[in-house]
Amino acid sequence: MASTAVQLLGFLLSFLGMVGTLITTILPHWRRTAHVGTNILTAVSYLKGLWMECVWHSTGIYQCQIYRSLLALPRDLQAARALMVISCLLSGMACACAVVGMKCTRCAKGTPAKTTFAVLGGALFLLAGLLCMVAVSWTTNDVVQNFYNPLLPSGMKFEIGQALYLGFISSSLSLIGGTLLCLSCQDEAPYRPYPPQSRAGATTTATAPAYRPPAAYKDNRAPSVTSAAHSGYRLNDYV
């Protein structure tokens, strides 16, 4: 029962991490305008994400434009795209494997493959969380380095957007949930197709012979020397 509760908790955390990873991938709030220097008072803010860049006006109007060229994008943005897409795909595969492998489901019940699916789902969640963590950490490091670069004008500096914070939280949930899924299957006994033989039955013990009454041994006695002599044959003939 305890391992089932751990599996449910791990799956719930991992599922929340998967949803957060999807939202992080879609949102354009990876970089936002840094209000420093001459940009302290401005009516326009710029947002940059993996797929589009947006302009936010003080009137509450958003204007977004999708990146039209893939090769014109910087390499760090292309790498972040690839990592986040792979992370989302792995999270979906991990969710399917975990549903099959959990004890509370009927899929593959009573087979050794059920535990294998649960461990595989946990491992895929771990890998997905790691890829998401690498992507958001790489982008955060790039934003911080550009922000403290004195050669860069203040109009080209950006701050950490809300999507990066969500990415850190989502990747942490995926890592924790995947770890719980893997640990919940660690203490289970291996599958055996036949019931194990008891220790008492494995050792052979000598059993006493069955009791027979004395009358049963009367006909089994060997003939005496006297009876053999009276039968017409002498014992000396056989020597």
Swiss-Prot record:
Localisation per UniProt entry: Cell junction, Tight junction; Cell membrane
GO cellular component assignments: bicellular tight junction; plasma membrane
Tissues and organs where the protein is expressed, per its UniProt entry: Expressed in all sensory epithelia of the inner ear vestibular organs, as well as in liver and kidney.
Membrane topology: Multi-pass membrane protein
Gene3D superfamilies: 1.20.140.150
GO MF annotation terms: identical protein binding; structural molecule activity
One BP annotation, GO: calcium-independent cell-cell adhesion via plasma membrane cell-adhesion molecules
Source taxon at top rank: Eukaryota
Record topology, Cytoplasmic segments: 1-7, 103-115, 184-239
TM spans (from-to): 8-28, 82-102, 116-136, 163-183
UniProt entry keywords in alphabetical sequence: Cell junction, Cell membrane, Membrane, Tight junction, Transmembrane, Transmembrane helix
InterPro entries tied to this protein: Claudin, Claudin_CS, PMP22/EMP/MP20/Claudin
Pfam families in alphabetical order: PMP22_Claudin
PANTHER family the record matches: CLAUDIN
Protein name (record): Claudin-14
Organism: Mus musculus (Mouse)
